[in-house]
Amino acid sequence: MEHTYQYAWIIPLLPLPVTMSIGFGLLLIPTATKSIRRMWAFPSVLLLSIGLIFSANLAFQQINGSFIYQYLWSWTINNDFSLEFGYFIDPLTSVMLILITTVGIMVLIYSDNYMSHDQGYLRFFAYMSFFNASMLGLVTSSNLIQIYIFWELVGMCSYLLIGFWFTRPSAASACQKAFITNRVGDFGLLLGILGFYWITGSFEFRDLFETFNKLNNEGNSLFPTLCAFLLFLGAIAKSAQFPLHVWLPDAMEGPTPISALIHAATMVAAGIFLVARLLPLFTGIPYIMNIISLIGVITLLLGATLALAQRDIKRSLAYSTMSQLGYIMLALGLGSYRAALFHLITHAYSKALLFLGSGSIIHSMEPLVGYSPDKSQNMVLMGGLTRYIPITRTTFLLGTLSLCGIPPLACFWSKDEILSESWLYSPSFAVIAYFTAGLTAFYMFRVYLLTFEGSLHVNFQNYSGTQNTSAYSISLWGKEEPKSVNSLFSTMKTNNETKNILFFEKNIYQFNENVINQMRDFTTPFLRKNTSMYPHESDNTMLYPLLILVVFTLFVGFIGIPLVQGEGEIDLNLLSKWLAPSKNLLYPNSEDSIDLYDFFINASFSVSIATGGIFLAFIFYGSPYSPLQNLDLMNLLVKIGTKTKRVSLDKIANIVYNWSHNRGYIDIFYTNVVTQSIRELAKLTQFFDRYIIDGITNSVGVLSFFAGEAIKYLVGGGRISFYLFFYLFFILIFVYFLFLSL
């Protein structure tokens, strides 16, 4: 056991050789390096697999084990200040190591095919390997300084990958937005680290917790509360929590595989990791725990409402990620360490599955609509993909059901535990959390139904509002190029189906029924042909990671089933044994396992809410040929209600659309108020600097010049040195008498 821990420092270093080899290869022998570029995927996967083996070994040894501090190197500046670098292994570290390596391996295998035709293939794998190394270094850090160093490296890799196609203006803008937003959080994190060092005199976690608990008993908690909030500010930005969440949807401009790794399973979880790591510190400051839970509940509701009317499939999943991270943050604010960590595990695998599934969907749509994200990621142009990509559809459906909280899939067990814990803390928070669970089921099945049910909705004329049928493809370096598209794929839709697709949308396009019937007979035979011009299933190297993540989605939830079979029998709660001696900080004396009857009572309520959300999604977005559509429930509701109620329903739908389409008006507020105010302040500062500061300086010079000229004129000639001496003499006399008067 000690022998394994002794070499744990190797884990963060394993991905680095790939990054360094690609970098030196492109610098020294670029032609040879590019000629064997597809071979670089193998060492990337191999080295990360070795890291997975080490991580799994450490995780098994952590069951009922103790924490391990190991110092590798010390930098001593003087006798009073030194920095010690090493690694810290505990259950939280083990969880994150396994998450990063497993999801990272799946993403690297997937990316080999997804990025195979991209000119930046080598650059992509270099960035990904460096990100994996930075993230592994972050979670094994033994002190706050180490965390901050790797925190910045993780952020740098994120910016590089978000702006991977840097010639596209939208990608460059998204990269800048992510950088600026995270600068706010990172600056707060740095100030918080320095503040706690000033309080405790140490950066080490163990010393920090012990010293702060002793000092906390003496009172005067204002400054520690401020420092703790600054630390939490870093987590708010990195984990896309309100109000610093605005960068995450724009980050979808990067390649889809990075969304699965960085913006679902790992980097956005870095903020969660930081709060979980510092939770013993935060629990001594009640105000901070209240703030954490409040930010979490606001974020989970906001993310769900913003996802209700999104057209872009990746942005819908991004807002879903934001909402689910809000659930985890709420659990941490409640002090429910185990529930938060459990949902972190289950959500990471389910959301990675969904993001990789969305990449497979986009990959299948690109031959039809071109390589423009506005079209290939637009759910309005999808539909009926079940018959073309059945494997992707099955995996995406399982990931959707898991995120909705449907048993026995993974997210059901963890989300239900958070919902139960929220009742113990605040019924009002619990009501919001349960309501958001219903919204989650609604918008996730909205994504699924718009993508896979019905028929193919590719219709460029009606979508773009133009008369031509040309699309725009984005080249491998982001340059837009015109690309002709076969007009055969302007598939007609029935009126009922069109309404379902564009619910919460501004414009609903109507078609003549006679034209629709004529075109349907013409297009149906062609739709049954398996040609390259129709959506097609992805290659095996993209499907294998999906199938493996399905296995995790199906079974990873069973490690935390909070059930006990009876007195003296086996406790099924393996996660609690793994996390021992970590305790639930909300109620330390409570048991982690609950009775079977109580569990089913709690679970039935959450499952009922999720089922209701799915039912509503089928009503609004289901196929026009489904049994629910035959019931015509919408018209039934209109007949039962009055015309006034119908108008009110339309107004509500319009409000929901505007709220979601405008991102809750938060981006508009930042642009029109915050950004504009900063610009006006900058202009005022520039005016003050140019006309006041520079004016005073220039005025002194001008006055000196005219004074010299006046003296020269009065004296009537002579050597210039005499004039200067005469001038300075009177200045000194004036200053002397001025000081005497004071």
Swiss-Prot record:
Q: What class of enzyme is it?
A: translocase
BP term (GO), one = electron transport coupled proton transport
State a single Gene Ontology molecular function. quinone binding
> What's an example GO cellular component term for this entry?
chloroplast thylakoid membrane
**Which EC number applies?**
7.1.1.-
The record's catalysed reaction(s) read: a plastoquinone + NADH + (n+1) H(+)(in) = a plastoquinol + NAD(+) + n H(+)(out); a plastoquinone + NADPH + (n+1) H(+)(in) = a plastoquinol + NADP(+) + n H(+)(out)
Annotated membrane topology is:
Multi-pass membrane protein
Its subcellular locations are: Plastid, Chloroplast thylakoid membrane
Q: Which family does it belong to?
A: Belongs to the complex I subunit 5 family.
Assembly, per entry: NDH is composed of at least 16 different subunits, 5 of which are encoded in the nucleus.
Q: What does this protein do?
A: NDH shuttles electrons from NAD(P)H:plastoquinone, via FMN and iron-sulfur (Fe-S) centers, to quinones in the photosynthetic chain and possibly in a chloroplast respiratory chain. The immediate electron acceptor for the enzyme in this species is believed to be plastoquinone. Couples the redox reaction to proton translocation, and thus conserves the redox energy in a proton gradient.
Q: What is this protein called?
A: NAD(P)H-quinone oxidoreductase subunit 5, chloroplastic
Q: Which organism is it from?
A: Lemna minor (Common duckweed)
